[in-house]
Amino acid sequence: MRYTQFFIPTLKETPSDAEVVSHQLMMRSGMIRKIAAGIYTYMPLGLRSIRKFEQIVREEMNRAGAIELLMPGVQPAELWIESKRWAQYGKELLRFKDRKDNEFCMGPTHEEIITDIARREVKSYRQMPVNFYQIQTKFRDEIRPRFGLMRGREFIMKDAYSFDVDSSAADLSYDKMYQAYNRIFERCGLNFRAVEADTGSIGGSASHEFMVLASSGEDAIVSCNACRYAANVEKAEGVRQQQGGAGQQALTKVHTPDKKTIAEVAEFLGLPQSGTVKALVLSNGEGQFVMALVRGDHELNELKLKNRLGWDEIQMATDDEILRFTGSPPGFLGPLGLKAELQVVADYAVETMADFVIGANETDQHYTGANTGRDFQISQIADIRLIGAGDPCPRCSGGTLEVWRGIEVGHVFKLGTKYSSSMNATYLDKDGKEQIIFMGCYGIGIGRTVAASIEQNHDENGVIWPLPLAPFHCSVVAINAQKDEAVMAAAQDIHDRLEAAGVEVLLDDRDERPGVKFKDHDLIGIPLRIVVGGKNLAEGNVEFKQRAGGEMQLLAPEQAIESVIAKVRESCGGSR
């Protein structure tokens, strides 16, 4: 492909609304163009990378036995009402009516459609296991679309759905998809982690997220330095330690004037924050309340607490609600001397503490020398804190956890019978008895993965594509191509020989200064580059360079061609 016959509208300046690197570089390199908030056109260069990733996904889905179909983007409301998600999903679901006043939505996901297909078409145990997948454009009306393809409203997604006769068979299907996802991201050349995660609004019994590691990642994840354990920080498990010794101090009320935060109280009393207990009052928004206790230097994990209590929602109580239960404004809360009955849930770390500081439920007052059991009672001991760096691994002995930033690019769920039960998707077993189908669902953000690759692979000059996702494998840059026929002929020959070997090549034949060409090629990030110039060519050489920090080498054209072919075959050799 000649540069002059392709279309790459690069920008010199970064658009003002582009906040993260991937958004900036995708706009500047001419990969995408914004049409509306969170809605983008994939320009020719960007579409090539999108298609590359889609092909890898298709190959691995097919290898895992999944079957491709294509479901409609527009979905009827009655299916969502049947699954009970029409009311639950909120304003992110774009709803509209047709001319006959029938209600529809633009699909942000396809559990309802695929479950409807299954209950119509999958009638016997003989038809399972079966796994369907699609690559489809979806729409989710994000309240604040940002970061380009990272959090758009319209997006391309691969979603797959497995159907099995029972939980054990569903586990096998889940494992197949889990392994397929690992192969997909390995083939893309990405540094990633598969982490345990919460099931969120999709529901189900278990899930894993696939996270591309990047300093700009919105999600915090933890992984063990000694074993394969990894989890989203919201899901990461705490380890229950052995209980410490009994407290020795007497419970003493102390005056703490205007000291409302843990840091202020600890400093005032000359204690480490780990010697204090933080009390928080929370609500489910439906009249139920709880007081959560965590060590002063720890943070409450609201998701863990919500799941522990079986609540659908969780939120901080209002000042008036706090006053009703404690008689105190926020800043001086504690579990001792509550004014109304309130369930108290303490984190594992609190039960190991002795002689600690708590709020006295009075303005400017705290207690020192507090101890659980002796001074106040706890309703439940549970793992309810956020886990951090240095915490012990919950899976192995001796390992400690490290914290990373990650970008979620894939998610796999064990749905169980959540959708099949509500939508009556059943089959007949070997004995002719009707049974509920077990399901799994598996998603990959196509555009998001391409953007995450840029977040992980770039420098101050532009994108540094991993070869499998690059729009072109190699660029051949002809210097003074319009004036030097020998240079252009040699560049064309290299281009043709590489293409014949299956290498995707962009031949830069523009009438531009060398510096302009080099800057553009650094920006768009093509991994391999051969530069053909008159002086070097006269000596039988061309320049060969790798975008990822490689030094420029002078090689004979034949050697340069062989180097490119070898690197492409090594990185893009197909399904493994």
UniProtKB/Swiss-Prot annotation:
Subcellular location: Cytoplasm
UniProt KW Disulfide bond keyword: no
UniProt keyword list: Aminoacyl-tRNA synthetase, ATP-binding, Cytoplasm, Ligase, Nucleotide-binding, Protein biosynthesis
MF annotations from Gene Ontology: aminoacyl-tRNA deacylase activity; ATP binding; proline-tRNA ligase activity
Keyword Cytoplasm belongs to the record: yes
Disulfide bond positions: none
A Gene Ontology biological process term: prolyl-tRNA aminoacylation
Top enzyme category: ligase
Pfam family, one: tRNA-synt_2b
HAMAP family, per the entry: Pro_tRNA_synth_type1
Function: Catalyzes the attachment of proline to tRNA(Pro) in a two-step reaction: proline is first activated by ATP to form Pro-AMP and then transferred to the acceptor end of tRNA(Pro). As ProRS can inadvertently accommodate and process non-cognate amino acids such as alanine and cysteine, to avoid such errors it has two additional distinct editing activities against alanine. One activity is designated as 'pretransfer' editing and involves the tRNA(Pro)-independent hydrolysis of activated Ala-AMP.
Protein name as it appears in the record: Proline--tRNA ligase
Biological source species: Trichlorobacter lovleyi (strain ATCC BAA-1151 / DSM 17278 / SZ)
Record gene name: proS
